[in-house]
């Protein structure tokens, strides 16, 4: 007889535990859904703010570029223009990241080629002069 009571109490405890686990899972899934919806809303608002900020920065950069494009520039103004161009490239890279990385790679390669030309140009000139002098002495 004690066995029946122990079994009944164990069954009640197990079913109560199963219901509490099920309720916990449901509340967690509802919480996850709410969090996901909140994140979507935040991302949407963030996207709108980001695009508005990009548009404002592009407009400001264009106005400043037009201002500095007309007339002579001081070295400081030239530096400002370089920074504005860099900002414009960065803003464009947010819109098209693949193209921006390709442009950056091309720009880096062109810079490297220019450095090599600056270094190799005088060296090749000296080598050419030395070979020319040797040929004159031999000939």
Curated annotation (Swiss-Prot):
Propeptide at which positions?
A: 19-43, 74-118
Keyword annotations: Amidation, Amphibian defense peptide, Antibiotic, Antimicrobial, Cleavage on pair of basic residues, Cytolysis, Fungicide, Hemolysis, Secreted, Signal
Q: Where Asparagine amide occurs along the chain? A: 70
A Gene Ontology CC term for this entry? extracellular region
Q: List localization entries.
A: Secreted
Which BP terms from GO are recorded?
Answer: defense response to bacterium; defense response to fungus; killing of cells of another organism
Tissue specificity is: Expressed by the skin glands.
Superkingdom assignment? Eukaryota
Q: Which residues in this protein are found as Isoleucine amide? A: 138
Q: Which residues form the signal peptide?
A: 1-18
A Pfam family hit: Bombinin
The cross-references to InterPro entries, in alphabetical order and at most eight, read: Bombinin
Function of the protein: Maximin-4 shows antibacterial activity against both Gram-positive and Gram-negative bacteria. It also shows antimicrobial activity against the fungus C.albicans, but not against A.flavus nor P.uticale. It has little hemolytic activity. It does not possess a significant cytotoxicity against tumor cell lines. It does not possess a significant anti-HIV activity. Maximin-H3 shows antibacterial activity against both Gram-positive and Gram-negative bacteria. It also shows antimicrobial activity against the fungus C.albicans. Shows strong hemolytic activity.
Q: Which family does it belong to?
A: Belongs to the bombinin family.
Name listed for the protein in its UniProt record = Maximins 4/H3 type 5
Per the UniProt record, the source organism is: Bombina maxima (Giant fire-bellied toad)
């Amino acid at each position: 007889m004690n066995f029946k009571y122990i079994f009944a109490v164990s069954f009640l405890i197990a079913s109560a535990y199963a219901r509490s686990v099920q309720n916990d899972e449901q509340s967690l899934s509802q919480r996850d859904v709410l969090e996901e919806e909140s994140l979507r809303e935040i991302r949407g608002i963030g996207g709108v703010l980001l695009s508005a900020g990009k548009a404002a920065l592009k407009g400001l950069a264009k106005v400043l570029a037009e201002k500095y494009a007309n007339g002579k520039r001081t070295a400081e103004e030239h530096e400002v223009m370089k920074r504005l161009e860099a900002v414009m490239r960065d803003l464009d890279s947010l819109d098209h990241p693949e193209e921006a990385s390709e442009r950056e790679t091309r720009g880096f390669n062109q810079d490297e080629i220019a450095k090599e030309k600056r270094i190799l140009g005088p060296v090749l000139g000296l080598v050419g002069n030395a070979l020319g002098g040797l040929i004159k002495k031999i000939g």
